[in-house]
Amino acid sequence: MVEIILPDGSSRSYDQETLTCGQIAASIGKGLAKAAIAGVVNGQKVDLDAPVPHGAQVAIITEDSPEGLEIIRHSASHLMAQAVKTLFPQAQVTIGPAIENGFYYDFDYERPFTPDDLTAIENCMRKLAKRNEKVERRVMPRDEAVAYFQAMGELYKAEIIGAIPAGEDVSLYSQGEFTDLCRGPHVPSTGKLKAFKVMKAGGAYWRGDSRNKMLQRIYGTAWATEADLKAYLTQMEEAEKRDHRRIGKDLDLFSVQEDAGGGLVFWHPRGSRIRRVIEDFWKDRHVEAGYEFLYTPHIANRQLWNTSGHTDFYSDSMFSPMEVDEQAYQIRPMNCPFHILIYKDRRHSYRELPFRWGELGTVYRYEMSGALHGLFRVRGFTQDDAHIFCTEQQIEEEIQRILDLTLDILRTYGFSDFEINLSTRPEKSVGSAAIWDKATEALRRAIVSRDLSYVVDEGGGAFYGPKIDVKITDSIGRKWQCSTVQLDFNLPERFDMGYIGEDGESHRPIMIHRALMGSLERFFGILVEHYAGWFPMWLAPVQAVVCSITDAQHAYAETVLAALKKAGLRVEIDLRNEKVGYKIREHTLKRVPYLLVVGDKEREEGTVNVRLRSGKSLGSLPIQDVVERLVEEAASRALSASEDQEEA
């Protein structure tokens, strides 16, 4: 007799000596049995055929759940490795994890894989999946596993296993003639893998170290159903059209100059105009929210990074030290220690708290060249950083204020679908259980008080405090992590921060880190792709272009330009000797919201013929009316003109 407890608290008894998750799923219903791909026994993910002990708490993982998708993708990486070994027996397998929306596997092979190779690999995967080969787990002593893979010529696998402590067992998974090292769990058979596609190939260094050999990495995606796969591929096609790197070049917004080094962004005049609008809006909102602004250095003595702990815990992401006056200095990867030094510059009373200090601070972090990607992964970027120093009693109110400010700013940019995660105390942490519980509850209450739904990430907090993450959803359904609100019990301790409390004693302040956009560069890239470059008028680098029809209107066109510029609008003029239709098409492709055409009729009447980039004509309007219209639209931060409902 085996009795188990289900997630809803109910129990089930089975009159048999051994029991598996697969049998439990089948006993509950045919639908669950069909959708099941793994189980959770006493909090541990296991294969469907793993034995379930008496009294265990059991849950079934289905293919459409986040956990199920991760297992499908990991199993698909094994299927791809099996296909590669079938087609290219000399290739050595290395590692192949599941990643967001897919998977990859790295191979040591004599040449890069071609597009034809990738097609052949995918076709082979489909044949292997149709065989519906059983996926079997076995456990082997470490030394025996090393010898096993060495005998097969899989030296990378042998190296990985060799790093495991002696005397430990390792688990292997086999399907057909293919065997791989893996913790699992995996799908019960290859037939469970129905919706997948090989996407692309590239290079990757072994263990991510440029001193090691370059391997061949193949990426793929896998989903529970063909419909989900099709929807994802459609989304990826749309994302390719919206690629911020291409649009950034087309609209002359920014560049990455390899002569200066990878991952370093150069903002061109038009991109700088948008950045200035973003920065000014950010500052205005923060002034309204009671923040003060700081300006701090870009480098600091290495001793500061020793005190903050960055030298011990973050050195791999920091650039190498430079020597100044026989002392080591390093460029900053974060702004936090600088704000703390300003706090410590004098003593503080509880009456002064909270301090809300913000800085658009540029930081520098080392990234492998292969990881760099447009504005999304760079080596130098500007954080919309702020730190709040407050008392324990002020935490909840400050978090509420931060959430209000965050959502207000994100909504203004056109984002309205949010996913909020609350990450709690991990196994290893600093600070007492009492302060963790109190702070976590304050974060939870702040979220609930704003009628926001959220997901708890148990144990997912940093070692120094709980946090809130806010993800936004863009116009094609992709989710982006942007905003983070992080409590910190560590740095106030390391820097011996304090304030005099109402009782006359010294107390530690609570430190709250928060970035609402994350970094200006990455957020700008998200905006470019969200709007596909069709920015709302208030964000557009060029809000209007004045186009003359012939030379006879040049002087009048300049008058119109001057009136618009005087009103603070971002306007350009096109006096080229080209047909007006050509000019309109060109500036429409440049996504300019307003095209202002002036001919003899407009010059004589003191008007402007107004066209929207959607193709709609508003007819001829007096100059002052046009100025007022554009100023009002820009000031309102409308996401589209009332007559211009073209979607990005």
Curated annotation (Swiss-Prot):
Q: How does it assemble?
A: Homodimer.
Per the UniProt entry, the disulfide pairs are: none
Regarding protein family, the annotation reads: Belongs to the class-II aminoacyl-tRNA synthetase family.
Role this protein plays? Catalyzes the attachment of threonine to tRNA(Thr) in a two-step reaction: L-threonine is first activated by ATP to form Thr-AMP and then transferred to the acceptor end of tRNA(Thr). Also edits incorrectly charged L-seryl-tRNA(Thr).
Enumerate the residues binding Zn(2+): C336, H387, H513
Q: What is this protein called?
A: Threonine--tRNA ligase
Single GO BP term? threonyl-tRNA aminoacylation
Q: Which reaction does it catalyse?
A: tRNA(Thr) + L-threonine + ATP = L-threonyl-tRNA(Thr) + AMP + diphosphate + H(+)
Q: What keywords are assigned to this protein?
A: Aminoacyl-tRNA synthetase, ATP-binding, Cytoplasm, Ligase, Metal-binding, Nucleotide-binding, Protein biosynthesis, RNA-binding, tRNA-binding, Zinc
- Which cofactors must be present for this protein to function? Zn(2+)
Positions of region (Catalytic): 243-536
Query: InterPro entries recorded for this chain?
Result: aa-tRNA-synt_IIb, aa-tRNA-synth_II, aa-tRNA-synth_II/BPL/LPL, Anticodon-bd, Anticodon-bd_dom_sf, Beta-grasp_dom_sf, TGS, TGS-like
User: Cofactor binding mode, per the note?
Assistant: Binds 1 zinc ion per subunit.
